[in-house]
């Protein structure tokens, strides 16, 4: 099968970007690329293997200034529309090679970044509505960039806290202990972990106050969510690791319960064998469920997306950028180091941790999708073209691995719009506006083209064709997690589900029973890979406490003398993850 025609997929994208960059929000900061430069960058991107992280981002904007002493400074915005990630290139006149630094804008809605001082003393210019800051972190006897790099922190502050230097750190368990020791040795415990990290290491510049937003009545939302389509509704002893409102005597299967001290978050529990015969007996959609799967507990969490923003970060190691071992033959080009022509994101840095500027708003985190080695096809048509369809991903407006048509995709746009769908060629026109995206396999549930009802995807019953993978001993039924999008009366809900053991068929039937419009697989095989935690709002608590969907997930967090430091928010991790922030 031939490769997808890249130019056809991106027709009109240059014009789309030109209109987007002309918006008033980009009146300051680096000048957008000219039409000529944009066309050159797009041509580079449209090759089968762009070959570098810069070539993968055709909407990037660059600015270069030169000092009177020969110092050359270049600033690259990977996506001016999103205004979050920058690469700083510094080359002294007598240097053997330039130095590169990955910078992150701590508040993209406020700060616009550019360079000044051309022909004199170069500096970074950081402009806000009523403020401007000039800084040259490469200058002086003890350059701020060197000091920030020596901290060993995943995010080190620069320029009075307006920028972060993203540092390379390890996401291993050994490094978690090292970070915990660093915290113990350098901090007097007695504040919350949020203040510990933000106040002591990142200074008060990162503390933010959020106005309260109008919250829907929990009872009304529970009523709107309704009950799952089950044949029976027994009260179950099983329950998630959250404190729930009204569940003191147990949880009724298929019903929703508000999570205590976590507005906008709800939980449910069931077993696939309880699903109504109306769904289970529909022929030709899924495989039959065996007795083990029918009686296995499923724990679900629903997020009212009117109250949350969704984000995504890569881990320090996963997903990686080289080839999966799965594609072969026509699905693999041995002449290039990875499916996009590179096997490293350098000079960008993936650090597996939530930005400290977002800690006071974080409501939940959960692990992302497959590692790169599992995230491509070994069998079926998808294995034979488009380099085996390695799952794509995009962070902070920066495309890190190409998004392929036909793959299940979670995405967020620049205006906060959240979606979950099968990616299409036409959707590539959204690329300049994408803030986050993650692909993982194919649809478990997608809308029926005639009725709009959520029905199992075409490849749910195909083990190889759907790239569903399995347990260590190649069993299709194993511990799995998935997510779904459901819309109720114009209100979007993101559902995350933990299946103690399930096949794709059992997952699809469960999401059908809960009325999902679209659903996709996340990760599988261990509680570490299916980790999910909430962070309730408790005013008098001096820690950021994590409550886990399943109690065993707490073992992944880092223990300290004052309590557990949660994964993804308190230390770097080697796996990618999603996070939900309370809207400001």
Regions found by a protein language model. Name each.
Residues 2-14:
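Bacterial N-terminal signal peptides that target proteins for export
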Residues 27-399:
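Zymogen propeptides
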Residues 12-22:
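Bacterial N-terminal signal peptides
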Residues 431, 444-445, 455-458, 468-584:
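Extended C-terminal subregions enriched in glycine
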């Amino acid at each position: 099968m031939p490769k997808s025609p890249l130019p056809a997929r991106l027709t009109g994208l240059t014009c789309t970007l030109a209109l987007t960059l002309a918006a008033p929000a980009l009146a300051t900061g680096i000048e957008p690329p000219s039409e000529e430069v944009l066309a050159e960058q797009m041509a580079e991107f449209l090759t089968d293997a762009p070959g570098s992280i810069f070539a993968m981002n055709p909407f990037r904007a660059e600015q270069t200034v030169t000092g009177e002493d020969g110092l050359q400074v270049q600033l690259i915005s990977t996506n001016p529309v999103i205004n979050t990630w920058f690469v700083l290139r510094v080359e002294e006149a007598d240097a053997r090679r330039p130095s590169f630094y990955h910078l992150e804008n701590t508040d993209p809605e406020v700060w616009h970044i550019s360079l000044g001082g051309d022909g004199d003393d170069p500096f970074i210019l950081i402009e806000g509505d009523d403020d401007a800051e000039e800084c040259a972190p490469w200058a002086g006897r003890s350059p701020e960039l060197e000091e920030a790099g020596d901290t060993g922190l995943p995010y080190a502050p620069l320029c009075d806290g307006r920028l972060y230097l993203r540092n390379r750190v390890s996401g291993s368990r050994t490094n978690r202990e090292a970070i915990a020791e660093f915290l113990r040795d350098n901090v007097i415990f007695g504040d919350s972990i949020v203040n510990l990290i933000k106040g002591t290491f990142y200074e008060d510049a990162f503390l933010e106050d959020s106005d309260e937003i109008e919250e829907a009545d929990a009872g009304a939302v529970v009523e709107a969510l309704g009950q799952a389509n089950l044949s029976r509704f027994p009260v179950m002893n099983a329950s998630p690791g959250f404190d729930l409102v009204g569940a003191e005597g147990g949880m009724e299967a298929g019903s929703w319960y508000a999570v205590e001290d976590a507005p906008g978050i709800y939980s449910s529990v069931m077993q696939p064998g309880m699903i109504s015969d109306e769904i289970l007996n529909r022929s030709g959609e899924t495989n039959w469920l065996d007795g083990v799967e029918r009686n296995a507990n499923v724990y679900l969490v629903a997020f009212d997306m009117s109250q949350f923003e969704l984000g995504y970060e890569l881990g320090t190691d996963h997903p990686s950028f080289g080839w999966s071992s799965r594609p072969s033959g026509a699905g693999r080009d041995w002449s290039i180091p990875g499916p996009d022509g590179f096997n490293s994101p350098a000079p960008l840095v993936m650090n597996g941790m939530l930005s400290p500027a977002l800690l006071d708003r974080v409501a939940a985190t959960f692990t992302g999708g497959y590692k790169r080695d599992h995230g491509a096809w070994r069998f079926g048509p998808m294995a034979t073209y488009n380099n085996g369809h390695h799952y794509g991903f995009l962070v902070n407006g920066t495309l890190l691995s190409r998004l392929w048509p036909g793959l299940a995709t979670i995405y967020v746009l620049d205006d906060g719009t959240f979606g979950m769908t099968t990616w299409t060629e036409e959707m590539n026109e959204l690329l300049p506006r994408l803030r986050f995206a993650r692909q993982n396999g194919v649809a478990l549930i997608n809308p029926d083209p005639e009725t709009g009802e959520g029905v199992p995807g075409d490849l749910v019953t195909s083990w190889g064709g759907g790239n569903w993978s399995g347990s260590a001993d190649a069993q299709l039924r194993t511990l799995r997690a998935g997510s779904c999008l459901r819309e109720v009366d114009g209100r979007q809900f993101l559902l995350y589900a933990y299946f103690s053991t399930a096949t794709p068929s059992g997952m699809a039937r469960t999401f059908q029973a809960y009325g999902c419009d679209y659903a996709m697989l996340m990760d599988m095989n261990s509680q570490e890979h299916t980790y999910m935690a909430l962070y309730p709002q408790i005013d008098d608590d001096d820690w950021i406490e994590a409550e886990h969907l399943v109690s065993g997930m707490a073992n992944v967090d880092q223990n300290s003398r004052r309590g557990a430091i949660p994964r993804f928010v308190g230390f770097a991790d080697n796996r990618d993850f999603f996070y939900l922030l309370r809207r400001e």
